[in-house]
Amino acid sequence: MNSVDLTADLQALLTCPNVRHNLSAAQLTEKVLSRNEGILTSTGAVRATTGAYTGRSPKDKFIVEEESTKNKIDWGPVNQPISEEAFERLYTKVVSYLKERDELFVFEGFAGADEKYRLPITVVNEFAWHNLFARQLFIRPEGNDKKTVEQPFTILSAPHFKADPKTDGTHSETFIIVSFEKRTILIGGTEYAGEMKKSIFSIMNFLLPERDILSMHCSANVGEKGDVALFFGLSGTGKTTLSADADRKLIGDDEHGWSDTGVFNIEGGCYAKCIHLSEEKEPQIFNAIRFGSVLENVVVDEDTREANYDDSFYTENTRAAYPIHMINNIVTPSMAGHPSAIVFLTADAFGVLPPISKLTKEQAMYHFLSGYTSKLAGTERGVTSPETTFSTCFGSPFLPLPAHVYAEMLGKKIDEHGADVFLVNTGWTGGGYGTGERMKLSYTRAMVKAAIEGKLEDAEMITDDIFGLHIPAHVPGVPDHILQPENTWTNKEEYKEKAVYLANEFKENFKKFAHTDAIAQAGGPLV
């Protein structure tokens, strides 16, 4: 089968009488309810559940091994190859399956707020609630949007279609398969809506660097003077909390590109975690959950239809999807200039990284590649001890290219635009987990504020002798003694032992990167 046949198949599918094109949020909400796909909550949002899969399925994600891309992809456990033949067989099956549905829902929009670099996308859904999710998460076309001649990337989403690993070349009945040559993503066997969002992000992480644009898994905001700040950080580091700032406007909460003219949001909406969400702690997210929003796997009271954000009955990974304009404090369109400050957030449960340090370009590249945080792992006896977690470029599951490509682009951007880079530890102080305490949020906010407002540019710096980090001697609103982690530990020997242990974990993790010896030497720990 050749690509002409695939295109013809797709056109035949899109013109089927059962296809509903570009329905409004209200129309899709009606469809969700009439088709019993979800319920309406007390605030007017749609709530859907996703069955067995309440998160991504990384082991079921593949990239088609094609002539034009096979020498560019960083093949391995994240980017698993699948043959063109297997893809085309599955494609035919999925298209046939979708044609037989009573109704299909199609959204046509974009990824990328900057018109120069936007990618047209077409999302074909078996479920109306998935189409509402896509409509609210991606960029919705406006009346004056020019028709693009570029062929769209198409998502074919068939959650109730299940693959047969014996004949289809998959690992299970679930599959997420990207073909760059056919500009197609096949998703089947999972109802988790986040697969659509992250598949488009993975594609942009391949396409944007080819145009000399750094694609980034980060949030971004801008101050009144046009000063842009980027926030990188893995789950639990405080990225959402710290980038939602009443004095600054949100550019985006999760995915961005950095071009020659500045930063732009890749999406048109937000996909916020909502476990333990409260109006007091995160009013912007809480108040965005209204008519047109989608709640995923959130427990809702049968009678009052009120959401219970503290209940993790379905999963800890409860989510809300809503268009970005449901937040008041935003930039429109979602673009701004070059960043003046970049913040890497980590939650170090060993309690040995400083609460804030300023990084050289090489250190920035090193810590970007490392993508460190720690998580607390339970044991049978209920005792918890920290575990190191490294996620390359703070977004390892979504990077099709070798890691050094992104790190070198970051280094180049820092050189060209003079951004200051900071490593901020939102984790433990005065000892590790169990003996120390979590860094006070008010202190972290004060440190981040000082960093992004340029107040640390001329600060006196003290160089840490284990990690080589440059720690400010003073930060407005923060007690001086907590800035040096060793000062907060009663047992200095134990501090040193734990710090050297973590430094060695960094070095061990860094061995996996090719073409990075110079970065490791200039940016890594000193011990």
Curated annotation (Swiss-Prot):
GO terms for molecular function: ATP binding; metal ion binding; phosphoenolpyruvate carboxykinase (ATP) activity. It catalyses: oxaloacetate + ATP = phosphoenolpyruvate + ADP + CO2. It comes from the Bacteria. Its EC number is 4.1.1.49. Gene3D superfamilies: 3.90.228.20, Phosphoenolpyruvate Carboxykinase, domain 1 (3.40.449.10), Phosphoenolpyruvate Carboxykinase, domain 2 (2.170.8.10). The keyword rRNA-binding does not apply. Mn(2+) binds at K198, H217, D254. PROSITE patterns: PEPCK_ATP. CDD domains: PEPCK_ATP. Its main location: cytoplasm. Binds 1 Mn(2+) ion per subunit. Pathway: Carbohydrate biosynthesis; gluconeogenesis. Pfam families: PEPCK_ATP. GO terms for biological process: gluconeogenesis. Belongs to the phosphoenolpyruvate carboxykinase (ATP) family. This is Phosphoenolpyruvate carboxykinase (ATP). The lineage of its organism: Bacteria, Bacillati, Bacillota, Bacilli, Bacillales.
